[in-house]
């Protein structure tokens, strides 16, 4: 597996590219932000979140809000290669409880989270993008 490291400000563009590509390829996801806007959003969150990346160049990243034990984002250029699991396991190794919200239409992500030990807790809460979401939890 590739090495995991904490992201720095110069990684924001690569992380934004991964999200932007996913949005472009996902028919149900509204395209609300340009690549430059996504980069700025990630940069703005860096001081308040732990952002972890895999690869050089970066091919997966996870944004973690430690005070809330919340995974705020998990994106991979090539899902199914084990990089999401690697990032989740990294966060699990330092936590006894995790939570996250996932778009209700993202059934592939739901299957992944359930394989990783997460269970569903809440359904159909509207996210900031107007799409219903499901909250998942994991406990050690």
Model-derived regions: residue spans:
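A short beta-loop-alpha structural element at the N-terminal edge
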Residues: 2-17
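A short helix-loop-beta-strand connector motif used in the catalytic cores of GNAT acetyltransferases and
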Residues: 40-53, 70
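A short, internal acetyl-CoA/4′-phosphopantetheine-binding micro-motif in the GNAT/acyltransferase core
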Residues: 69-82, 102-103
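Conserved acetyl-CoA-binding loop-helix of GNAT-fold acetyltransferases
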Residues: 80-93, 111, 115
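Conserved GNAT acetyl-CoA-binding A-motif
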Residues: 93-106
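Conserved catalytic-core motifs of GNAT/GCN5-like acyltransferases
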Residues: 101-103, 119-135
């Amino acid at each position: 597996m590739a090495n995991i490291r904490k992201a720095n400000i110069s990684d924001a563009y690569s992380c934004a590219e991964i999200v932007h590509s996913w949005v472009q390829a996902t028919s149900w996801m509204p395209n609300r932000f340009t690549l430059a806007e996504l980069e700025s959003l990630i940069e703005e969150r860096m001081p308040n979140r732990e952002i972890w990346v895999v690869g050089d160049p970066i091919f997966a990243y996870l944004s973690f809000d430690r005070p809330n034990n919340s995974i705020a984002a998990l994106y991979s250029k090539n899902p199914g290669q084990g990089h999401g699991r690697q990032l989740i396991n990294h966060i699990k190794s330092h936590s006894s409880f995790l939570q996250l919200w996932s778009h209700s239409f993202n059934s592939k992500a739901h299957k992944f989270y359930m394989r990783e030990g997460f269970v569903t807790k809440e359904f159909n809460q509207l996210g900031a993008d107007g799409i219903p979401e499901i909250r998942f939890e994991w406990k050690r």
